Amino acid sequence: MTPLLRSAALSAVLSATLSGGLLAQGDQREPPADPACPLLTDRELDAATGLDYGPGGPIDVGQGAFGGSTCLWGGMGADPAKDLPQIGVVFIPPGSRGSHTEFYRARAPGAGCTRETLRGVGDLAFVDSCEKAQRGVRVYVKTGRNDVFLVVDQLQQRPLSWAQPVAVALARAAAPRARRP
């Protein structure tokens, strides 16, 4: 083997070895932290609901025009006897579309929904409680430059009178954590 050929072969082997190692290192990196899940603790969720939810999980639901990240707890499972109402919290950073909360505040509540302003939750907050279509409670909060959207739905046998205080308590807990510069 000539020195030139040996050098080329050695370069090829080293390149393949180093590239594979670098790719493997890239795969071992931790995924970026989801900013939605830390907005609520398991203890806060269990205290507000009186149920044992366990940890929430980040989920990519294609956040739509406003972006953001979502964390979900509960929901429909394989065993209906163990189903818990679904609770979701979305952290929405500032974006080109403006405030998610202000956008929805400018719209009328949906058919079968009532709207109530919340005081002492973030800079601006309101709750929509819907009995008919999409039965559940939605809380919209503007806190600093960010928005929080909290949903309690898939209520199974629980009434809105159970869901609304749960949603408001969780929004009160999440709002200060979502306020970031």
Predicted region positions:
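Functionally engaged cysteine thiol sites
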Residues: 37-38, 42, 69-71, 113, ...
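Short, Lys/Arg-rich flexible segments
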Residues: 25-63, 87, 165-181
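A short, solvent-exposed beta-edge/loop patch
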Residues: 26-32, 112-181
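Secreted/processed peptides and extracellular or luminal domains of membrane proteins
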Residues: 42-43, 77, 119, 136
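Exposed alpha-helical structural elements
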Residues: 44, 99-103, 162, 166
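N-terminal secretory signal peptides that target proteins for export/translocation
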Residues: 1-4
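Short, solvent-exposed recognition patches
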Residues: 52-131
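Bacterial N-terminal signal peptides
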Residues: 7-20
